[in-house]
Amino acid sequence: MNISAEYWLHHAVFYAMLFLIHYFCGLLVIHRNLKVNYTRKINHFAFFFLPTLLSMVIDYPYSAATFFIDLVCAIIFLTFFIAPVRNRVRVLSVMFCSFDRPEDRPLTLTWLYTQFIASYLVLIPLLAYFESHALLPVIMIIIIANGVGDGLAEPVGIRFGKRKYTTYALFTQEKYVRSYAGSACVFITTFIAILAFHSYFSPIQFIAAVLTVPVLITLAEAFSPHTWDSPLIYAVGGALLIGILHFL
């Protein structure tokens, strides 16, 4: 397994920046009383889009091996925040405050661990399929739907979401709240993403994608367990795109 030096440099810079962002967001929560719901989404955007931005400067060859190492790195990153570690390292404790929503306790890390693993398990076959059919850029539709749409859903819902609905969560009987305004962010973002990648569809495929993908991804986000949006968005959106591109 030959991993390029550019890959390691890219990820060293990425995780250094990610640690800094988490730390400063944690300080904002502790000293400025900024809502964790907002800082958590700042972290979310950083995790999704910093790698892409860094790749413009530090590019590396993609492979199944690098994708697997990405998953390992994400799990190691989360492991820094388990209680025995963060309680002994003040910096990590501050960073943990940037994504530890009070309503998620004591399952904050459990949900993040399981969501990361489930998301990667869904993405691996999707990446393999789209790459084998020379359609790899199409997967960006569901990544944008999750990264931008779901990323905006919570802060928009908190600020503007007067009409809300409840959803369940794994490993608990508690109910959690989502907003129609937040779900609208997922719908609009997915619609725009399809428009941006329209060149990969035939006219009939494009019409089918526009009419079905935003609706079903929005429903996937709405009915997914609390904090478990990503794997459901990827699974539903990916399966639907494969169906459209393969059968139409």
Could you tell me what each predicted segment is?
Residues V72-A74:
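Aromatic-rich transmembrane-lumenal/periplasmic boundary elements in polytopic membrane proteins
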Residues L18-H22:
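Glycine/aspartate-rich loop-and-adjacent alpha/beta segment that forms the canonical ThDP
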Residues S202, F206-I207:
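Short alpha-helical packing/oligomerization segments
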Residues M1-L9, F24-F67, T79-I192, F197, ...:
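Interhelical loop and helix-boundary elements at the membrane-water interface
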